[in-house]
């Protein structure tokens, strides 16, 4: 499915379920990782997560589109468009849109960890973020710290 097809699908869903036209752009955003889609307030555009479409299919994508269109139409009308607003929850129920999308499975991307060791007391620190060993010292004895290992856990 490409951006033209997604634009057409969003326009059809908007007319069918909301009886109002969608007058802005709907696209896939390949950079989205943790959310099914997002409604951009400034531009009124809708961005959808391609990975959800690939993983869960068209039905889940339609649910996400309905959810984002709830944000869109309520914002355009000047009503409460945020998740906590009553207008938003009522419209979700009316169009049978999910309040939350399914969770994405844990990424198969390996977790990188860094292992540091104090030169004085031999205490080991395991960290996800790299640290500047010239700037930081051991929290126990104030000794120098050296990096002893960099591992890629999978």
Curated annotation (Swiss-Prot):
Annotated family: Belongs to the SprT family.
Cofactor(s) this protein cannot do without: Zn(2+)
Chain ranges of the SprT-like domain: 7-148
One Gene Ontology MF term: zinc ion binding
Cofactor binding summary note: Binds 1 zinc ion.
Protein name as catalogued: Protein SprT-like
Major place of residence: cytoplasm
Any one GO BP annotation for this protein: response to stress
Residues given in the record as Zn(2+) binding sites: 67, 71
InterPro entries xref list: SprT-like_domain (IPR006640), Uncharacterised_SprT-like (IPR023524)
């Amino acid at each position: 499915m490409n951006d033209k097809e997604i634009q057409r699908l969003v326009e059809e869903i908007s007319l069918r379920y909301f009886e109002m036209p969608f007058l802005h752009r709907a696209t896939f955003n390949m950079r989205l990782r943790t959310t099914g889609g997002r409604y951009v307030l400034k531009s009124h555009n809708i961005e959808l997560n391609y990975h959800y479409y690939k993983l869960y299919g068209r039905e889940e994508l339609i649910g996400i589109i309905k959810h984002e269109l709830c944000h869109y139409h309520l914002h355009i009308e000047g009503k409460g468009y945020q998740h906590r607003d009553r207008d938003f929850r009522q419209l979700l129920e009316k169009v049978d849109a999910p309040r939350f999308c399914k969770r994405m499975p844990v990424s198969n991307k390996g977790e990188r960890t860094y292992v540091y060791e104090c030169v004085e007391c031999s205490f080991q620190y395991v960290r996800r973020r790299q640290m500047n060993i010239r700037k930081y010292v051991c929290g126990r004895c104030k000794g120098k710290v050296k990096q002893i290992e960099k591992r890629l856990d999978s």
